[in-house]
Amino acid sequence: MFNNVWQKVAALLRAPISSLGLRRFEEHNRRVFVRSPAETRCHPEVLIEVNNMHSAHIAYSYLANVLGELHGARVVGYVVQANRSRKEAFKAWTKRTIGYAPYGAYRSFGTGQVVTPVLTRAQKARARRLFAHVYDGIASKTDIEAMRVSGIWIGDLVYDAYLREYARPTIIKASVEFVTSLRHSLELFVFWQDYLDAHDVRAINVSHTVYGNAIPLRIAVARGIPVYQVNLTHCYRLDAEHLFAYGDFTTFRERFAALPEAVRDAGLAEAQRRIERRFRGEVGVDMAYSTKSAFRAPSHPRLLSESPRKKILIAAHCFFDSPHSYGNNLFPDFYEWLDFLGQMSERTDYDWHIKTHPDFLPGSKEIVEAFVSKYPKLTMLPSDASHHQLIAEGIDVVLTVYGTVGFEYAALGVPVINASMNNPHIAFDFNVHARDVEHYRQLLLQLDALPLVIDRQEVLAYYFMAFIHHSPNLFLSDYDGTIHCLGGYAKQFTPAIYDVWLDQWTLEQHEALLAALVTFVESEDYRMDERHLPPPAAADVFPIPA
């Protein structure tokens, strides 16, 4: 009786704060994903990360049910971060109990228990001992980057978690912030190591393959447990050989060559059309998250000097946004990369320029300005400077770690040097890829002998494979149109996405997606694509240019 009363009270409390879209989504899920009580009580578990990325909940609902069915497992939610105060813990408990977002959405597709990483006294003691051992062994930033615990690599996760949480450009080992962040990362490691020891976990879904979110991933794949990262536009299976999502660019060249000639020709033509749209200044072409174009018409007086010296453009990255998204780079973070280039500016007779992205995050500009003050040979350009203007004024070489300028400047005939072997353009030869720091140094000292001949067809092939061949229309019939309808990329992470998706939902697409996910999971392939969807559904979700 008490449970019935509490359910009614919870419903009354929740009614005014639950969006109509969320309620529609929950009711829809309860209709289409029906599991027996026995299935929800079974011992094996499938872990699904709980977060507020509402568009991803749509994908989670499908993957959770497919994994639960295939493994005969119950779906268990988990949160990434432990509550740091009693107030936070009570707030989270209340939300879970009344089914407030996002917990109501998860409950509707079969998620029962939600695990929070709260450590016991014994676990905290182990984490303290582990911290003392790890911290004493850190002599450099590369030591942090290379950190392994119980043979499992987590250094990159520790590194990027700190940069993001504190919005710092680099790590200072002795700082209270880093000590706190490292302790927290190691506590998460201890918790998830013990959890996987004590529970029969058959699969895990994570939201990110970087930051602390990926600590359960690293421990799981070391034990042979499959891990997935699914969202509205992609679905990846991670293992010991593939620790990062979005890394399929390493096979772009060979996969493009294996396509039928007609598809290759049509793909190159479509890539040409879309690149031209980007270069005309159109915002969001195959980059839904972008809000400004760096290829607008020139709007500044001359920006580069008319000297005979080589003109270098450094395309700065956001310092806090996961430098290790694809793995390790030549430098442990973007700050160290810029500092190296600042030192190189003092050794060379070039005109050095640095530019932030028009969409730079708060704090980035100030850090770049500090570098310009430290290294007077660096000249800071306006963030809204047009790349067309810079090319017209004589930029000779562009430097990036792994940015999109790699293909953009190559398409316009300008050499680009990447400071990473884990960059999205690595399968092709239209950029120069520095192997290590010494190779990078020699390339910069000998720009006149840069070993590069740009084949524009390669640039188009890359663009086709990266942005066209795999459509984003996995769970939506028109992802780009939906983002526009919602009012921008960020709006998909609000409950508004539920209504838009439900208006597009069809039983035929629903069944095709379930079948495709089953095929994908059983295949153990790295990425879900047209191979896993039977025709004609594959033609709708993964269209091939005609």
Regions found by a protein language model. Give the residues of each.
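Short loop/turn segments at strand-loop or loop-helix junctions that form parts
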Residues: 50, 79-82, 232, 311-321, ...
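A donor-sugar binding/catalytic signature common to diverse glycosyltransferases
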Residues: 212-217, 231, 383-431
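Conserved N-terminal ligand/cofactor-binding loop architecture of enzyme catalytic domains
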Residues: 1-45, 49, 66-186, 232-293, ...
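Histidine-anchored nucleotide/phosphate-binding helix
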Residues: 54-77, 331-345
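Conserved catalytic-core segment of nucleotide-activated headgroup transferases in glycan assembly
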Residues: 280-370
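Conserved nucleotide-sugar donor-interacting segment of glycosyltransferase catalytic cores
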Residues: 188-243
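A short, glycine/small-residue-rich beta-strand->loop->alpha-helix junction that serves as a flexible
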Residues: 50-60, 206, 321-328
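Donor nucleotide-activated moiety binding/catalytic core segment of transferases
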Residues: 182-197, 350, 360-407
